[in-house]
Amino acid sequence: MKNAFKDALKAGRPQIGLWLGLANSYSAELLAGAGFDWLLIDGEHAPNNVQTVLTQLQAIAPYPSQPVVRPSWNDPVQIKQLLDVGAQTLLIPMVQNADEARNAVAATRYPPAGIRGVGSALARASRWNRIPDYLHQANDAMCVLVQIETREAMSNLASILDVDGIDGVFIGPADLSADMGFAGNPQHPEVQAAIENAIVQIRAAGKAPGILMANEALAKRYLELGALFVAVGVDTTLLARGAEALAARFGAEKKLSGASGVY
């Protein structure tokens, strides 16, 4: 078993991604052919469940883009289901400390290394037990990325980085800026300083730093600092702003107030 995304991070090859929030397999397949290295299927803020994640994994599978799945929470039951339908790389939200990071890793590993339940006869991940020795290969193919999104998590970053099995740490600029008192303004100098310091610290620890940033200048800055998995856009934003701009160019009567938001 292989995990091309995990291998790329280990090799230090920057991976450029796109966020998927439309919760639809047709749009996921369309975007899988756009040339991004990875696509984030969002189960935290988009209306996804295990079934819709499955159909998007199936839609993306024939393409080079690698899927990353974000569950709604650091929940071992939900993680088990996502792994069974074929997710190999998970982005775990709101990890605050090393204990929570260890729990995330344990949820992705079969015993004795972890607590993942064994149900491979029912699992797409094992191709319904057609992958030889799946139970002994699966652990090494898992890629665990944890999100730090608060001042508390930032203060615990060093201990989180010490957790065995953590492949990367993703900085959540929207929640971090809100927690720091600058909601809706991740470009505030204090927030930017925290982000840049974290990227350098994560990379120095031998882990992969990641972030979502639609501002192209900032995204390139993070890559220069050593970020290895950077999402540079969101499908819902691309569609909404593109449609609004097209309507405006043809003098559409409905006048929209200026769109706002972090991404």
Swiss-Prot record:
A GO molecular function assigned to this protein is: 4-hydroxy-2-ketopimelate aldolase activity
Q: In which pathway does it act?
A: Aromatic compound metabolism; 4-hydroxyphenylacetate degradation; pyruvate and succinate semialdehyde from 4-hydroxyphenylacetate: step 7/7
Claim: Lyase is one of the keywords in the record:
yes
Task: Identify the domain of life.
Answer: Bacteria
Q: Which GO terms describe its biological process?
A: 4-hydroxyphenylacetate catabolic process; phenylacetate catabolic process
Q: Which residues bind substrate?
A: Q147, A174, D175
Q: How is the cofactor bound?
A: Binds 1 divalent metal cation per subunit.
- Site note Transition state stabilizer, residues: R70
Q: Which UniProt keywords apply?
A: Aromatic hydrocarbons catabolism, Lyase, Metal-binding
Q: What is its EC number?
A: 4.1.2.52
According to its UniProt entry, what is the function of this protein? Catalyzes the reversible retro-aldol cleavage of 4-hydroxy-2-ketoheptane-1,7-dioate (HKHD) to pyruvate and succinic semialdehyde.
What do we know about how this protein assembles, alone or with others?
Homohexamer; trimer of dimers.
Q: What is this protein called?
A: 4-hydroxy-2-oxo-heptane-1,7-dioate aldolase
Q: Which organism is it from?
A: Salmonella paratyphi B (strain ATCC BAA-1250 / SPB7)
Gene that this sequence comes from: hpcH
